Each structure stands twice: as C-alpha cells, then as structure tokens.
C-alpha cells in the first residue's frame, strides 16, 4: 500500500468519525432535517424492508430450499459495547442460535478471533469463521460431535507478523486514553470507541506509521475501529463461498444462504449473495447506509425475533 493511500484513508477515517460525533449531529439538527431524514428513511426502507415485516414472503421464497444461516457476532448477536471484551451474547440469544443450528447449517463469521467468538457463543455443532473468515473451523464428520477441526487458514504465514504488530501498536498507542488493541489472531483491531475526538488524529497517525513499516498489511475501517489484516484477497464473502463449497452445496439450486450482519465488513458477504443471485443479506442497522443487503433489522433484539420465527416456521413445516 502506498504511503499516500494510507494517509488518505486515515484522513477519511478521522473525517468520518468527526462527522458522526453526537455533538455535531445535534448542533445542526432542525425540523427541516427531521423531515428530510424521515423521507430518506422511508426511501431506504422501501429498498431494504424489514425482514420481520416481510417474513411471510421470505418463507414463501424459501419453500423447498435448504436454508443456510450465516451470522455476524458483534452488533448482530450481541450489542456493541464500550468494552469489547464484554460483548456477551445473552442466554436467550444463545438458546435461539442453538435451535437455529438444530434445523439449519449455521456459521458465525466475525472479525474477532475464532477462539474469542467460541468463548462467547459456547455452542458446538456450528461453523466458526474468525478473523474475517481467515480462521475457519467446523464440526468434524465423526460421531464425536463435540470435536472440531481446522478447515482453512489462508493467512497462516502472517501469524508471526501479526503477533509482532500487535505488540508494536500496543506500545505506540498506550499514551492515547481509551485506545485499545485487540489481537484477533490473523488480524488486529484498534478500537476508537473510548477515544476522545481530540485523540483520533494522533491514533490514526500511529497506525499510519505502522503500516509504512509493514506494507504486507492493509487497513480497513469498521464501527469505531481500525483493522489491520493481511493483504490477501480474502474477506467474509470469500469465507461464505468457502463454507458453501466445503458443505458441498455451492452449486445446488435448492440452497438459500441467508447472511445477517451489521458492519461494513459484512458487505463483502452481502455482495457475494447478490452476485450469485441466490440467497440474501439482512443488514442490522437503525441508520441509513449503503448496502447490498435485501432486507433490514434494527438491532440484535430484532435479529433474535427473526431467528425465533424462523425456527417456529421450520417446526411447523416438519409437523413438530
């Protein structure tokens, strides 16, 4: 990555975070803006209707097809939290996901490390794809269903570098209040959520300097995070395709993949489904954003409701 490209991305990041500052949003708020935003929201909903409102139509489209569930973790199964180490899934959500996995092949694709997601979800019998799909594990084909095997790690050569960069960034950012660096095995995340606006530029500059020293890493942006990951052509969309292939159903016309996620990194998976012309994405968001998703849900509570209705529908089709 060129230094100018890095600088441009950093500047864009700082500008976007500044624009999202609550004080700036409130200071420019007026009745005219409310009306305008309502119109924009209505237009957006028309393009990405609620998956709850459209549930019956979705299920009609699913008749005779094998539904495969792909779920993001943060902001989808769990709430976004100030402390990223405390983004716990509720017992109720865990039980719903367990039921979903009973009736449908299920995978959780997250930017976190696979081990961290597994420690939160605590369910066996499902596929986990951590580090944005760079660390994929799934159930074995043996009778010992509690065992799991590594299926794919396309960035394994980068492990020593990631370990090194995590330590470098922790040292460089320790003087910036609120900044934290999370080791996600095959990528790393710099969290902005607790950093005051006055510290954004300094933090971004430290990330820029690290990227100059480690040109084999690339920069991506998520919800109040910067992420550094290997410069390989791999993302959540590639992970979705890999899982469909590994399950032996990638070429089947009777499969309906459903991906639910809230972050811009999930757009790679939404885009894959659009390009396949098979299945659909559901964006979890209370705000208007550009997306390849077909439907929307507002928050994890609505995700839970959608999954509950999905399980109920399946039980009814089976006569249970």
From Swiss-Prot:
Q: Which reaction does it catalyse?
A: alpha,alpha-trehalose 6-phosphate + H2O = alpha,alpha-trehalose + phosphate
* Pathway named in the protein's UniProt entry: Glycan biosynthesis; trehalose biosynthesis
Pfam families per the UniProt record, alphabetical: Trehalose_PPase
Q: InterPro entries attached here?
A: HAD-like_sf (IPR036412), HAD-SF_hydro_IIB (IPR006379), HAD_sf (IPR023214), OTSB-like (IPR044651), Trehalose_PPase (IPR003337)
Question: Which prosthetic group or cofactor does it need?
Answer: a divalent metal cation
Keywords in UniProt for this one?
A: Hydrolase, Stress response
The UniProt function text for this chain reads: Removes the phosphate from trehalose 6-phosphate to produce free trehalose. Trehalose accumulation in plant may improve abiotic stress tolerance.
Designated name of the protein? Probable trehalose-phosphate phosphatase C
């Amino acid at each position: 990555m060129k230094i100018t490209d890095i600088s441009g991305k950093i500047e864009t990041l700082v500008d976007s975070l500044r624009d999202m500052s609550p004080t700036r949003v409130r200071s420019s708020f007026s009745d005219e803006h409310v009306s305008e935003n309502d119109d924009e929201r209505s237009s957006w909903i028309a393009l990405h209707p609620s998956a709850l409102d459209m549930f019956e139509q979705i299920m009609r489209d699913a008749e005779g097809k094998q539904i495969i569930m792909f779920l993001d973790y943060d902001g989808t199964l769990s709430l976004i939290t100030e402390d990223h180490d405390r983004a716990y899934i509720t017992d109720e959500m865990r039980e719903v996901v367990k039921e979903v996995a009973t009736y449908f092949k299920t995978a959780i694709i997250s930017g976190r490390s696979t081990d961290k997601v597994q420690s939160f979800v605590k369910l066996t019998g499902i596929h986990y794809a951590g580090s944005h799909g760079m660390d994929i594990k799934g159930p074995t084909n043996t009778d010992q269903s509690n065992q799991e095997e590594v299926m794919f790690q396309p960035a394994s050569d980068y492990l020593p570098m990631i370990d090194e960069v995590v330590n470098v960034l922790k040292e460089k950012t320790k003087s910036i209040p609120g900044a934290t660096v999370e080791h996600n095995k095959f990528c790393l995340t710099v969290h902005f959520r607790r950093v005051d606006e006055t510290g954004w530029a300094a933090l971004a500059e430290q990330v820029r300097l690290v990227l100059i020293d480690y040109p084999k890493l690339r920069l991506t942006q998520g919800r109040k995070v910067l992420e550094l990951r290997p410069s390989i052509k791999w993302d959540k969309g590639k992970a979705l395709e890999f899982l469909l292939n590994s399950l032996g159903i990638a070429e089947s016309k009777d499969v309906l993949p459903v991906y639910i996620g809230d972050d811009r990194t999930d757009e790679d998976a939404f885009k894959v489904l659009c390009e396949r012309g098979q299945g659909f994405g559901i964006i979890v968001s209370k705000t208007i954003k550009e997306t390849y998703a077909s439907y929307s849900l507002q928050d994890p509570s609505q995700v839970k409701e959608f999954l509950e209705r999905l399980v109920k529908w399946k039980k009814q089709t089976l006569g249970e």
